Amino acid sequence: MSQPITRENFDEWMIPVYAPAPFIPVRGEGSRLWDQQGKEYIDFSGGIAVNALGHAHPELREALNEQASKFWHTGNGYTNEPVLRLAKKLIDATFADRVFFCNSGAEANEAALKLARKFAHDRYGSHKSGIVAFKNAFHGRTLFTVSAGGQPAYSQDFAPLPPDIRHAAYNDINSASALIDDATCAVIVEPIQGEGGVVPASNAFLQGLRELCDRHNALLIFDEVQTGVGRTGELYAYMHYGVTPDLLTTAKALGGGFPVGALLATKECASVMTVGTHGTTYGGNPLASAVAGKVLDLINTPEMLNGVKQRHDWFVERLNSINHHYSLFSEVRGLGLLIGCVLNADYAGQAKQISQEAVKAGVMVLIAGGNVVRFAPALNVSEEEVTTGLDRFSAACEHFVSRGSS
Protein backbone atom coordinates (compact mmCIF):
# COMPACT_ATOMS: atom_id res chain seq x y z
CA MET A 1 0.00 0.00 0.00
CA SER A 2 1.34 3.45 -0.89
CA GLN A 3 2.19 5.94 1.85
CA PRO A 4 -0.62 8.38 2.73
CA ILE A 5 0.11 11.89 1.50
CA THR A 6 -0.27 14.84 3.87
CA ARG A 7 0.27 18.59 3.64
CA GLU A 8 3.33 18.17 5.86
CA ASN A 9 4.98 16.17 3.08
CA PHE A 10 5.21 19.39 1.05
CA ASP A 11 7.46 20.93 3.69
CA GLU A 12 9.57 17.76 3.81
CA TRP A 13 10.06 17.16 0.09
CA MET A 14 9.52 20.33 -1.92
CA ILE A 15 11.82 23.29 -2.59
CA PRO A 16 10.04 25.96 -0.50
CA VAL A 17 9.16 28.56 -3.12
CA TYR A 18 5.43 28.28 -2.30
CA ALA A 19 3.38 28.39 0.89
CA PRO A 20 0.33 26.31 -0.07
CA ALA A 21 -2.92 26.20 1.86
CA PRO A 22 -3.17 23.78 4.79
CA PHE A 23 -5.42 21.37 2.85
CA ILE A 24 -4.89 19.25 -0.28
CA PRO A 25 -7.60 19.26 -2.97
CA VAL A 26 -8.30 15.81 -4.40
CA ARG A 27 -11.36 16.25 -6.61
CA GLY A 28 -13.08 19.01 -8.54
CA GLU A 29 -16.24 19.52 -10.53
CA GLY A 30 -17.28 22.83 -12.04
CA SER A 31 -16.45 25.56 -9.54
CA ARG A 32 -16.30 23.20 -6.58
CA LEU A 33 -13.34 21.39 -5.03
CA TRP A 34 -13.13 18.81 -2.26
CA ASP A 35 -10.14 18.14 -0.02
CA GLN A 36 -8.79 14.92 1.49
CA GLN A 37 -11.28 15.16 4.36
CA GLY A 38 -14.23 15.71 2.02
CA LYS A 39 -14.70 19.41 2.81
CA GLU A 40 -16.20 21.37 -0.09
CA TYR A 41 -14.85 24.69 -1.37
CA ILE A 42 -16.27 27.09 -3.94
CA ASP A 43 -13.35 28.02 -6.17
CA PHE A 44 -13.20 31.70 -7.08
CA SER A 45 -9.43 31.55 -7.63
CA GLY A 46 -9.59 29.46 -10.79
CA GLY A 47 -6.04 28.21 -10.39
CA ILE A 48 -4.93 31.86 -10.79
CA ALA A 49 -7.21 32.56 -13.76
CA VAL A 50 -6.40 29.23 -15.42
CA ASN A 51 -9.46 27.02 -14.95
CA ALA A 52 -11.66 29.07 -17.25
CA LEU A 53 -14.22 26.28 -17.60
CA GLY A 54 -13.97 24.97 -14.06
CA HIS A 55 -12.66 21.63 -12.91
CA ALA A 56 -12.90 18.41 -14.92
CA HIS A 57 -15.04 19.87 -17.69
CA PRO A 58 -16.46 16.87 -19.58
CA GLU A 59 -15.66 18.18 -23.07
CA LEU A 60 -12.07 18.99 -22.11
CA ARG A 61 -11.67 15.54 -20.61
CA GLU A 62 -13.03 14.02 -23.80
CA ALA A 63 -10.62 16.03 -25.97
CA LEU A 64 -7.67 15.06 -23.77
CA ASN A 65 -8.60 11.39 -23.63
CA GLU A 66 -9.19 11.19 -27.37
CA GLN A 67 -5.73 12.59 -28.15
CA ALA A 68 -4.09 10.62 -25.34
CA SER A 69 -5.25 7.41 -27.00
CA LYS A 70 -3.40 8.38 -30.21
CA PHE A 71 0.02 9.87 -29.34
CA TRP A 72 1.39 12.39 -26.86
CA HIS A 73 4.59 13.90 -28.16
CA THR A 74 7.00 14.01 -31.08
CA GLY A 75 9.26 17.02 -30.48
CA ASN A 76 9.63 20.04 -32.73
CA GLY A 77 11.07 18.06 -35.62
CA TYR A 78 7.48 17.21 -36.54
CA THR A 79 4.21 19.08 -36.49
CA ASN A 80 0.79 17.66 -35.64
CA GLU A 81 -2.84 18.18 -36.56
CA PRO A 82 -4.11 19.53 -33.19
CA VAL A 83 -1.50 22.31 -33.05
CA LEU A 84 -2.21 23.42 -36.61
CA ARG A 85 -5.95 23.51 -35.94
CA LEU A 86 -5.31 25.53 -32.77
CA ALA A 87 -3.07 27.99 -34.61
CA LYS A 88 -5.75 28.55 -37.26
CA LYS A 89 -8.41 29.17 -34.60
CA LEU A 90 -6.25 31.81 -32.91
CA ILE A 91 -5.39 33.48 -36.21
CA ASP A 92 -9.02 33.55 -37.31
CA ALA A 93 -10.13 35.03 -33.98
CA THR A 94 -7.45 37.73 -33.56
CA PHE A 95 -5.20 40.21 -35.38
CA ALA A 96 -2.41 37.63 -35.64
CA ASP A 97 -0.99 35.94 -38.73
CA ARG A 98 1.52 33.64 -37.03
CA VAL A 99 1.69 31.73 -33.72
CA PHE A 100 4.49 30.26 -31.60
CA PHE A 101 3.43 27.72 -28.97
CA CYS A 102 5.13 27.11 -25.66
CA ASN A 103 4.17 25.90 -22.19
CA SER A 104 3.51 28.95 -20.02
CA GLY A 105 3.00 32.68 -19.87
CA ALA A 106 6.59 33.30 -18.87
CA GLU A 107 7.81 31.39 -21.93
CA ALA A 108 5.43 33.33 -24.16
CA ASN A 109 6.70 36.64 -22.80
CA GLU A 110 10.31 35.50 -23.11
CA ALA A 111 9.65 34.69 -26.77
CA ALA A 112 7.97 38.06 -27.34
CA LEU A 113 10.87 40.02 -25.86
CA LYS A 114 13.43 38.04 -27.84
CA LEU A 115 11.46 38.54 -31.05
CA ALA A 116 11.19 42.28 -30.38
CA ARG A 117 14.94 42.61 -29.87
CA LYS A 118 15.70 40.63 -33.01
CA PHE A 119 13.16 42.58 -35.06
CA ALA A 120 14.73 45.88 -34.01
CA HIS A 121 18.30 44.69 -34.52
CA ASP A 122 17.56 43.32 -37.98
CA ARG A 123 15.63 46.39 -39.12
CA TYR A 124 17.39 49.26 -37.36
CA GLY A 125 20.65 48.05 -35.81
CA SER A 126 21.86 46.71 -32.48
CA HIS A 127 21.59 50.10 -30.76
CA LYS A 128 17.79 49.69 -30.72
CA SER A 129 17.53 47.37 -27.72
CA GLY A 130 15.61 49.28 -25.07
CA ILE A 131 12.53 47.74 -23.47
CA VAL A 132 10.00 49.86 -21.61
CA ALA A 133 7.82 48.08 -19.07
CA PHE A 134 5.79 49.27 -16.09
CA LYS A 135 6.10 49.42 -12.34
CA ASN A 136 4.15 46.73 -10.46
CA ALA A 137 3.92 44.62 -13.61
CA PHE A 138 4.31 40.86 -13.68
CA HIS A 139 5.48 39.00 -16.79
CA GLY A 140 6.86 35.72 -15.44
CA ARG A 141 9.79 34.21 -13.58
CA THR A 142 12.51 33.77 -16.19
CA LEU A 143 15.42 36.15 -15.70
CA PHE A 144 14.34 38.24 -18.70
CA THR A 145 10.65 38.38 -17.76
CA VAL A 146 11.20 38.93 -14.06
CA SER A 147 13.44 41.85 -15.00
CA ALA A 148 10.69 43.28 -17.21
CA GLY A 149 8.23 42.96 -14.35
CA GLY A 150 8.45 46.12 -12.30
CA GLN A 151 8.54 44.46 -8.89
CA PRO A 152 12.04 44.43 -7.39
CA ALA A 153 11.00 41.88 -4.75
CA TYR A 154 10.93 39.24 -7.50
CA SER A 155 14.23 40.18 -9.17
CA GLN A 156 16.57 41.70 -6.58
CA ASP A 157 18.18 38.38 -5.59
CA PHE A 158 19.29 37.50 -9.13
CA ALA A 159 21.57 40.33 -10.24
CA PRO A 160 23.09 41.12 -12.62
CA LEU A 161 19.84 41.50 -14.51
CA PRO A 162 19.46 41.90 -18.29
CA PRO A 163 20.22 45.53 -19.21
CA ASP A 164 18.23 48.13 -21.15
CA ILE A 165 14.92 47.61 -19.35
CA ARG A 166 13.28 50.68 -17.87
CA HIS A 167 10.02 51.06 -15.98
CA ALA A 168 7.42 53.80 -16.29
CA ALA A 169 4.42 54.44 -14.07
CA TYR A 170 1.37 52.44 -15.16
CA ASN A 171 -1.54 54.41 -16.59
CA ASP A 172 0.71 57.49 -16.88
CA ILE A 173 1.35 58.26 -20.53
CA ASN A 174 3.68 61.14 -19.68
CA SER A 175 5.88 58.81 -17.64
CA ALA A 176 5.98 56.36 -20.55
CA SER A 177 6.65 59.09 -23.09
CA ALA A 178 9.71 60.19 -21.13
CA LEU A 179 11.26 56.73 -21.58
CA ILE A 180 10.16 55.66 -25.08
CA ASP A 181 12.54 56.89 -27.77
CA ASP A 182 14.23 55.79 -30.99
CA ALA A 183 16.41 53.33 -29.04
CA THR A 184 13.33 51.51 -27.75
CA CYS A 185 12.64 48.17 -29.41
CA ALA A 186 9.47 47.28 -27.48
CA VAL A 187 6.93 48.31 -24.89
CA ILE A 188 5.36 45.48 -22.89
CA VAL A 189 2.17 46.12 -20.95
CA GLU A 190 -0.69 44.26 -19.29
CA PRO A 191 -4.12 45.65 -20.27
CA ILE A 192 -5.03 44.93 -16.66
CA GLN A 193 -2.26 44.59 -14.11
CA GLY A 194 -3.26 41.35 -12.40
CA GLU A 195 -0.58 40.61 -9.82
CA GLY A 196 -0.08 44.35 -9.47
CA GLY A 197 -3.53 44.85 -7.94
CA VAL A 198 -6.18 44.27 -10.65
CA VAL A 199 -5.65 47.73 -12.17
CA PRO A 200 -7.28 48.22 -15.59
CA ALA A 201 -5.49 50.42 -18.09
CA SER A 202 -7.33 53.43 -19.39
CA ASN A 203 -8.18 53.61 -23.08
CA ALA A 204 -6.17 56.80 -23.38
CA PHE A 205 -3.11 55.13 -21.87
CA LEU A 206 -3.11 52.14 -24.23
CA GLN A 207 -3.90 54.33 -27.23
CA GLY A 208 -1.07 56.63 -26.23
CA LEU A 209 1.34 53.68 -26.05
CA ARG A 210 0.24 52.59 -29.53
CA GLU A 211 0.97 56.06 -30.89
CA LEU A 212 4.36 56.27 -29.15
CA CYS A 213 5.40 52.87 -30.49
CA ASP A 214 4.38 53.85 -34.01
CA ARG A 215 6.29 57.11 -33.74
CA HIS A 216 9.50 55.42 -32.55
CA ASN A 217 9.28 52.17 -34.57
CA ALA A 218 8.91 50.08 -31.44
CA LEU A 219 6.77 46.97 -31.10
CA LEU A 220 3.81 47.06 -28.72
CA ILE A 221 3.46 43.83 -26.74
CA PHE A 222 0.27 43.07 -24.83
CA ASP A 223 0.78 40.55 -22.05
CA GLU A 224 -2.66 38.91 -22.00
CA VAL A 225 -1.59 35.87 -20.03
CA GLN A 226 -4.16 36.68 -17.33
CA THR A 227 -6.67 38.78 -19.29
CA GLY A 228 -6.94 36.54 -22.33
CA VAL A 229 -9.35 33.83 -23.47
CA GLY A 230 -12.59 35.44 -22.38
CA ARG A 231 -11.57 36.68 -18.95
CA THR A 232 -12.72 40.27 -19.58
CA GLY A 233 -15.83 39.42 -21.58
CA GLU A 234 -13.96 39.69 -24.88
CA LEU A 235 -11.79 36.90 -26.24
CA TYR A 236 -8.78 39.16 -25.61
CA ALA A 237 -8.75 42.43 -23.70
CA TYR A 238 -7.28 44.40 -26.62
CA MET A 239 -10.69 43.96 -28.26
CA HIS A 240 -12.33 45.70 -25.31
CA TYR A 241 -9.96 48.65 -25.67
CA GLY A 242 -9.88 48.82 -29.46
CA VAL A 243 -6.07 49.03 -29.44
CA THR A 244 -4.23 46.38 -31.47
CA PRO A 245 -0.72 45.29 -30.42
CA ASP A 246 2.03 43.93 -32.65
CA LEU A 247 2.59 40.94 -30.38
CA LEU A 248 0.28 39.31 -27.84
CA THR A 249 1.08 36.65 -25.27
CA THR A 250 -1.49 34.21 -23.97
CA ALA A 251 -1.47 31.22 -21.62
CA LYS A 252 -3.37 30.41 -18.37
CA ALA A 253 -6.99 29.97 -19.54
CA LEU A 254 -5.89 28.89 -23.02
CA GLY A 255 -5.44 25.33 -21.80
CA GLY A 256 -8.25 25.35 -19.26
CA GLY A 257 -5.85 23.82 -16.75
CA PHE A 258 -3.50 22.03 -19.16
CA PRO A 259 -0.13 23.84 -19.53
CA VAL A 260 0.09 25.77 -22.78
CA GLY A 261 1.19 29.24 -23.85
CA ALA A 262 1.39 31.10 -27.13
CA LEU A 263 2.89 34.17 -28.76
CA LEU A 264 0.65 35.75 -31.40
CA ALA A 265 2.35 37.93 -34.01
CA THR A 266 1.78 39.74 -37.26
CA LYS A 267 3.40 38.27 -40.35
CA GLU A 268 5.83 41.19 -40.53
CA CYS A 269 7.03 40.71 -36.97
CA ALA A 270 7.24 36.94 -37.28
CA SER A 271 9.34 37.16 -40.44
CA VAL A 272 12.54 37.86 -38.47
CA MET A 273 12.35 34.50 -36.72
CA THR A 274 13.97 31.68 -38.66
CA VAL A 275 14.80 28.05 -37.98
CA GLY A 276 16.87 27.88 -34.81
CA THR A 277 16.32 31.43 -33.53
CA HIS A 278 13.99 30.16 -30.82
CA GLY A 279 12.34 26.92 -29.82
CA THR A 280 10.91 24.61 -27.21
CA THR A 281 10.75 20.85 -26.82
CA TYR A 282 7.20 20.54 -25.52
CA GLY A 283 5.52 23.62 -26.98
CA GLY A 284 2.57 22.82 -29.22
CA ASN A 285 2.42 19.19 -28.19
CA PRO A 286 -0.74 17.42 -29.37
CA LEU A 287 -2.21 16.86 -25.90
CA ALA A 288 -2.09 20.54 -24.95
CA SER A 289 -3.22 21.62 -28.39
CA ALA A 290 -6.22 19.31 -28.44
CA VAL A 291 -7.42 20.63 -25.09
CA ALA A 292 -6.76 24.28 -25.99
CA GLY A 293 -8.63 23.90 -29.25
CA LYS A 294 -11.69 22.71 -27.37
CA VAL A 295 -11.29 25.56 -24.84
CA LEU A 296 -11.45 28.09 -27.68
CA ASP A 297 -14.47 26.36 -29.20
CA LEU A 298 -16.34 26.63 -25.91
CA ILE A 299 -15.28 30.14 -24.87
CA ASN A 300 -15.22 32.05 -28.15
CA THR A 301 -18.99 32.26 -28.50
CA PRO A 302 -21.33 35.22 -27.95
CA GLU A 303 -23.19 33.28 -25.27
CA MET A 304 -20.09 32.58 -23.19
CA LEU A 305 -18.55 36.05 -23.57
CA ASN A 306 -21.81 37.84 -22.81
CA GLY A 307 -22.22 35.51 -19.85
CA VAL A 308 -18.90 36.74 -18.46
CA LYS A 309 -20.22 40.30 -18.49
CA GLN A 310 -23.41 39.18 -16.74
CA ARG A 311 -21.43 37.32 -14.09
CA HIS A 312 -19.30 40.42 -13.55
CA ASP A 313 -22.47 42.24 -12.54
CA TRP A 314 -23.44 39.44 -10.16
CA PHE A 315 -20.08 39.62 -8.41
CA VAL A 316 -19.80 43.40 -8.24
CA GLU A 317 -23.34 43.91 -6.97
CA ARG A 318 -22.90 41.35 -4.20
CA LEU A 319 -19.37 42.46 -3.27
CA ASN A 320 -20.59 46.04 -2.93
CA SER A 321 -23.40 44.77 -0.71
CA ILE A 322 -20.92 42.87 1.47
CA ASN A 323 -18.80 46.00 1.68
CA HIS A 324 -21.84 48.02 2.74
CA HIS A 325 -22.09 45.77 5.81
CA TYR A 326 -18.41 45.52 6.75
CA SER A 327 -16.71 48.61 5.23
CA LEU A 328 -13.62 46.67 4.21
CA PHE A 329 -12.99 47.97 0.71
CA SER A 330 -12.33 51.36 -0.80
CA GLU A 331 -13.07 50.10 -4.33
CA VAL A 332 -14.26 47.08 -6.29
CA ARG A 333 -12.63 47.19 -9.73
CA GLY A 334 -11.77 45.12 -12.77
CA LEU A 335 -13.28 43.85 -16.01
CA GLY A 336 -15.29 40.72 -16.63
CA LEU A 337 -14.28 38.00 -14.20
CA LEU A 338 -11.01 39.54 -13.10
CA ILE A 339 -12.14 41.53 -10.08
CA GLY A 340 -10.19 43.17 -7.27
CA CYS A 341 -11.47 44.39 -3.90
CA VAL A 342 -9.11 47.10 -2.64
CA LEU A 343 -8.80 47.23 1.14
CA ASN A 344 -9.35 50.58 2.77
CA ALA A 345 -6.76 52.23 4.99
CA ASP A 346 -8.07 50.60 8.17
CA TYR A 347 -7.23 47.14 6.81
CA ALA A 348 -4.22 47.92 4.62
CA GLY A 349 -1.88 45.00 4.08
CA GLN A 350 -4.31 42.34 5.32
CA ALA A 351 -5.54 40.77 2.07
CA LYS A 352 -3.81 37.49 2.90
CA GLN A 353 -5.60 37.27 6.25
CA ILE A 354 -8.96 37.72 4.52
CA SER A 355 -8.11 35.02 1.98
CA GLN A 356 -7.22 32.68 4.84
CA GLU A 357 -10.55 33.36 6.53
CA ALA A 358 -12.26 32.68 3.21
CA VAL A 359 -10.66 29.24 2.95
CA LYS A 360 -11.86 28.40 6.45
CA ALA A 361 -15.36 29.41 5.35
CA GLY A 362 -15.14 27.17 2.27
CA VAL A 363 -14.37 29.60 -0.54
CA MET A 364 -11.07 30.06 -2.39
CA VAL A 365 -9.98 33.56 -3.42
CA LEU A 366 -6.70 35.14 -4.48
CA ILE A 367 -4.73 38.18 -3.44
CA ALA A 368 -2.93 40.72 -5.62
CA GLY A 369 -0.39 42.25 -3.30
CA GLY A 370 -1.12 43.01 0.32
CA ASN A 371 -4.09 45.27 -0.29
CA VAL A 372 -6.27 43.55 -2.90
CA VAL A 373 -8.49 40.47 -2.66
CA ARG A 374 -8.74 39.06 -6.18
CA PHE A 375 -11.45 36.97 -7.84
CA ALA A 376 -10.75 35.01 -11.05
CA PRO A 377 -13.46 32.33 -11.15
CA ALA A 378 -14.44 30.02 -13.97
CA LEU A 379 -16.15 31.88 -16.80
CA ASN A 380 -19.07 29.45 -16.62
CA VAL A 381 -19.54 29.66 -12.83
CA SER A 382 -23.23 29.17 -12.09
CA GLU A 383 -25.46 31.69 -10.35
CA GLU A 384 -25.92 29.21 -7.50
CA GLU A 385 -22.15 28.81 -7.13
CA VAL A 386 -21.72 32.59 -7.11
CA THR A 387 -24.41 32.98 -4.45
CA THR A 388 -23.07 30.18 -2.25
CA GLY A 389 -19.47 31.28 -2.63
CA LEU A 390 -20.18 34.91 -1.83
CA ASP A 391 -22.32 33.88 1.15
CA ARG A 392 -19.23 32.11 2.45
CA PHE A 393 -17.03 35.09 1.59
CA SER A 394 -19.41 37.36 3.49
CA ALA A 395 -19.15 35.08 6.53
CA ALA A 396 -15.35 35.21 6.22
CA CYS A 397 -15.44 39.02 6.11
CA GLU A 398 -17.69 39.10 9.18
CA HIS A 399 -15.31 36.84 11.08
CA PHE A 400 -12.29 38.87 9.98
CA VAL A 401 -13.84 42.15 11.09
CA SER A 402 -15.12 40.77 14.41
CA ARG A 403 -11.76 39.17 15.15
CA GLY A 404 -10.00 42.46 14.53
CA SER A 405 -12.32 44.40 16.80
CA SER A 406 -12.38 41.88 19.63
From Swiss-Prot:
Its cofactor is pyridoxal 5'-phosphate. The keyword DNA damage does not apply. Its EC number is 2.6.1.81. It catalyses: N(2)-succinyl-L-ornithine + 2-oxoglutarate = N-succinyl-L-glutamate 5-semialdehyde + L-glutamate. PROSITE patterns: AA_TRANSFER_CLASS_3. The keyword Cell division does not apply. Belongs to the class-III pyridoxal-phosphate-dependent aminotransferase family. AstC subfamily. This is Succinylornithine transaminase. It comes from Escherichia coli O127:H6 (strain E2348/69 / EPEC). The lineage of its organism: Bacteria, Pseudomonadati, Pseudomonadota, Gammaproteobacteria, Enterobacterales. The gene is astC.
